[in-house]
Amino acid sequence: MSKLKQGTFITFEGGEGIGKSTQCQMLYEYLKSQNIPVILTREVGGTNVAEKMREILVHTDLLPMSELLQAMAARYDHMVKKIIPALQAGNIVICDRFIDSTACYQGLELENGIELVYNLHKDLMPPLMPDLTFFIDVESSIAIERINSRNMSNKFDVRGLDFYNKIYDCFKGLSKKFPERIVTIKASDLNPEQVHELIKKHLNLI
């Protein structure tokens, strides 16, 4: 029996260049083909206001706390206007990044920042966490090769190996901290179709 039920909130996490957005799209298209109500969204972004905040966040050098608060403000708008209404209507919601990305990208820049991110979410956001998170585990050296082949970039794309290793280690740590929620998909040696099949298998869709 499928693990999916109406109003399930699924997030995909990991560093840059790991094929995360591709997997979001593939799962979305598959669920649509099965006539399962589903929406696909992303963070930072997902609403008109949040997308404008995204442009500032990914293309502007901000102070670490300013960057964190920008991400949290965008999330509040996204949750209230899009994610929660979609879940209440019975949709599966697939989100490309959520709170774990904030912890790793913004939290790491602040003292006790990872704990701060989750505390802010608990205190300021509507009471919602993902039901399931897929961490797409791709080694940093492979991810950087993929990033370098891109035509477009933002400030996170152009940082060095040390940065990507820190992000990778952060996601690995979160997967151990939240094992009941985060499923690790080891994808360094797999093509997108193989990763997609593993995700479907975990969801009991095949």
UniProtKB/Swiss-Prot annotation:
A Pfam family of this chain: Thymidylate_kin
A molecular function (GO) term: dTMP kinase activity
The keyword Heme appears for this protein: no
Keyword annotations of the record: ATP-binding, Kinase, Nucleotide biosynthesis, Nucleotide-binding, Transferase
Cited InterPro entries: P-loop_NTPase, Thymidylate_kin-like_dom, Thymidylate_kin_CS, Thymidylate_kinase
Its EC number(s): 2.7.4.9
Top EC class for this record: transferase
Keyword ATP-binding set for record: yes
Record protein name field: Thymidylate kinase
Gene from which this protein is expressed: tmk
